[in-house]
């Protein structure tokens, strides 16, 4: 039974409310620079329970360096040697005070869902190759600023882990393994957990009075004695026809990702043209060598080696398809966000169109 629990796959991630607040504060204060940190907890029969977190030390960047350099250093922090030593020291100190201090992954911040890149893959692979039951928490600061918490958990799929370990992302290997951009990540449900004491306190908070029909006053004295409270009512903000700025930014990022995808596709097509050209030269050389050997055999001479083309010609190296897979996965991410953003916008546009059409 213990073996079954030990080998149970991860089904969900449970994060303490205090940990969520620490992650949100760290990511918000570091915005727009990428924020990363370590999460600790325990594995409870397939459920990762995150009970604490701490951020990685920030790297001082001179004013002459660009913002992208600071973000690159912060994104690579989880696998930096100095931070690995720092993480082990922090876990050792937490164990000394009897805190659940088993490393269960790391967290990072994102902007408009823009987190699918090589740094994210390398960080998660660094954790997951040491411990299969580690996850990456992604906090989207831009989405959370709209009022709803955006906290997602990901892990690399076993198929992608195998392919990344072997560094085989050629067309043939992807065709044989049937690995697509949809198989890179496995998203896990995230639950926010409160302690029993906090839950009891929340239940003791007085609830607002239930909405009911307000009796009309019979006289002026009734109004003075019991003034009527104006009920909450929806404002006119929902009728605003301006396009959501988050939708515009997501569309811009979507176009950039599509452009990157086409750039990678053009590079692969260039490789295919180069390969076809070299293969045609090899075929011509082999046909010529066979004709020469036939003439030499007719003249009772020893034939020349026919595998000499391997020394004379060099086939081009196929570029890795990993970048293209990540771009495709990022495009899919942006497309889902655009679909979610356009739900309200489409309804408003149809309402305006209906009023503008002649009857």
Curated annotation (Swiss-Prot):
Keywords: Cytoplasm, Initiation factor, Protein biosynthesis. Residues 13-160 form the MPN domain. Its main location: cytoplasm. Signal peptide: none annotated. The keyword Cytoplasm applies. Component of the eukaryotic translation initiation factor 3 (eIF-3) complex. This is Eukaryotic translation initiation factor 3 subunit H. It comes from Neurospora crassa (strain ATCC 24698 / 74-OR23-1A / CBS 708.71 / DSM 1257 / FGSC 987).
């Amino acid at each position: 039974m213990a073996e079954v629990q030990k080998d149970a796959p991860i089904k969900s991630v449970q994060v303490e409310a205090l940990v969520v607040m620490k992650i949100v504060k760290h990511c918000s204060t570091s915005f727009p620079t990428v924020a990363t940190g370590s999460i600790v907890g325990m594995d409870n029969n397939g459920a990762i329970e995150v009970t604490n977190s701490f951020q990685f030390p920030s790297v001082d960047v001179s004013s002459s360096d660009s913002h992208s350099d600071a973000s690159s250093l912060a994104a690579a922090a989880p696998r930096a040697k100095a931070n690995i030593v720092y993480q082990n020291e922090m876990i050792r100190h937490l164990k000394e005070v009897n805190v659940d201090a088993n490393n269960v992954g790391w967290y990072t911040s994102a902007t408009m869902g823009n987190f699918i890149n090589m740094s994210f893959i390398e960080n998660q692979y660094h954790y997951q190759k040491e411990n299969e039951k580690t996850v990456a928490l992604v906090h989207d600061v831009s989405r959370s600023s709209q009022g709803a918490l955006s906290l997602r958990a990901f892990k690399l799929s076993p198929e992608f882990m195998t392919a990344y370990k072997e560094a085989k992302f050629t067309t043939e290997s992807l065709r044989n393994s049937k690995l697509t951009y949809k198989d890179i990540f496995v998203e896990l449900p995230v639950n926010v957990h409160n302690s029993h004491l906090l839950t009891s306190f929340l239940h003791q908070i007085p609830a607002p009075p239930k909405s009911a029909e307000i009796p009309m006053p019979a006289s002026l004295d009734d109004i003075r004695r019991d003034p009527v409270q104006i009920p909450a009512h929806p404002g006119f903000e929902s009728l605003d026809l301006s396009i959501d700025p988050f939708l515009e930014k997501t569309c811009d990022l979507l176009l950039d990702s599509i452009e990157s995808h086409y750039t990678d596709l053009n590079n692969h097509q260039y490789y295919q043209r180069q390969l076809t050209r070299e293969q045609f030269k090899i075929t011509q050389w082999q046909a010529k060598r066979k004709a020469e050997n036939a003439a030499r055999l007719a003249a009772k001479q020893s034939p020349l080696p026919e595998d000499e083309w391997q020394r004379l010609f060099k086939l081009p190296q196929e570029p890795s398809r990993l970048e293209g897979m990540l771009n495709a996965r990022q495009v899919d991410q942006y497309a889902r966000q655009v679909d979610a953003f356009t739900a309200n916008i489409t309804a408003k546009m149809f309402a305006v169109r209906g009023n503008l059409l002649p009857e």
